[in-house]
């Protein structure tokens, strides 16, 4: 997976040309995978010992930022009604895991340079709101990806890492967008999963090792596209490929769930890195 800033395409080419899901979330660093491995160890020990505790429900404040080239849908402009639908999609996906989202604010900016995803840090420095516990979502029409996010980590408020934090979403992938495979709003579901600490289900691209560092997601040696129900790229390991998991690359209609282990992981990361900022 390539880092977001390595690929920037022309505004027009970044929308309807996408035939497969693409995620520009940076690969986890060695430090981040060490944290994930430690969390997996602690979570699995608690589960085996029978003393795993249900963490308190989490409500995340969301700040929407719509960046467009004009006040038209073709320019990337999204209405408040569309933002409301996107919020509903997130809440439906995350509610079974005691995570909910509440709109804290929304703003609209006409800026062709920002809309092309060529000035990420400048855009975020100007628009970001709230604390490290608050989710900032930036809708842009010109990113070469369906979306990207940043994993939770230790940050100093006001630092570049603080401003980079958040989720960037291709405008056409919102509910009712022009991308027929990806217009149910689950690009945001997927990227918010990263923001809460989850890796791709195919992390590592192999049938052994640590995978995504979550014990109950089956191993998967490559990403899944479309909706390949019953696919098994790791026949020597238990379970078919988790193609309906939100953290795979399947089409939006194929997605159905997070696992119990992923739920625990999101709460673990929230407690470790974001909860104290509320």
UniProtKB/Swiss-Prot annotation:
Keywords: Disulfide bond, Glycoprotein, Hydrolase, Metal-binding, Metalloprotease, Protease, Secreted, Signal, Zinc. Pfam families: Peptidase_M43. GO terms for cellular component: extracellular region. It is found in: Secreted. PROSITE patterns: ZINC_PROTEASE. Disulfide bonds join 227-254. It comes from the Eukaryota. The active site is at residue 191. One of its GO terms (biological process) is proteolysis. The keyword Chloroplast does not apply. GO terms for molecular function: metal ion binding; metallopeptidase activity. Glycans are attached at residue 51. Its EC number is 3.4.24.-. Zn(2+) binds at residues 190, 194. InterPro entries: MetalloPept_cat_dom_sf, Peptidase_M43. It is an enzyme of class 3 (hydrolase). Residues 1-19 form the signal peptide. Belongs to the peptidase M43B family. Secreted metalloproteinase that allows assimilation of proteinaceous substrates. This is Extracellular metalloprotease GLRG_06511. It comes from Colletotrichum graminicola (strain M1.001 / M2 / FGSC 10212).
């Amino acid at each position: 997976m390539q880092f977001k800033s390595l690929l920037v395409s022309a505004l027009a080419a970044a929308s309807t040309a996408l035939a497969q899901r693409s995620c520009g979330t940076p690969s986890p660093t060695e430090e981040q995978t060490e944290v994930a491995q430690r969390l997996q160890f602690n979570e699995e020990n608690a589960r085996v010992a029978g003393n795993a505790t249900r963490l308190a429900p989490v409500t995340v404040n969301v700040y929407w930022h719509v960046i467009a080239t004009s006040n038209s849908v073709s320019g990337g402009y999204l209405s408040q009604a569309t933002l409301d639908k996107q919020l509903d999609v997130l809440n439906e996906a995350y509610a079974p895991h005691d995570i909910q989202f509440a709109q804290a604010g929304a703003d609209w900016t006409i800026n062709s340079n920002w809309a092309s995803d060529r000035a990420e840090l400048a855009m975020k420095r100007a628009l970001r709101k709230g604390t490290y516990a608050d989710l900032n979502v930036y809708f842009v029409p010109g990113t070469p990806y369906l979306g990207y996010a940043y994993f939770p980590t230790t940050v100093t408020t006001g630092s570049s890492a603080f401003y980079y934090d958040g989720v960037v979403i291709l405008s056409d992938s919102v509910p009712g967008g022009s991308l027929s495979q990806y217009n149910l709003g689950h690009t945001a579901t997927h990227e918010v999963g990263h923001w809460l600490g989850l890796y791709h289900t195919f992390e590592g691209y192999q049938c052994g090792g640590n995978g995504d560092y979550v014990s109950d997601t089956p191993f998967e040696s490559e990403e899944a596209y479309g909706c390949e129900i019953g696919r098994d790229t790791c026949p020597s390991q238990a379970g078919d490929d988790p193609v309906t998991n939100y953290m795979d690359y399947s089409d939006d209609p194929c997605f159905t769930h997070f696992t119990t282990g992923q739920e625990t992981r999101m709460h673990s990361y929230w407690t470790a890195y974001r909860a104290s900022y509320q």
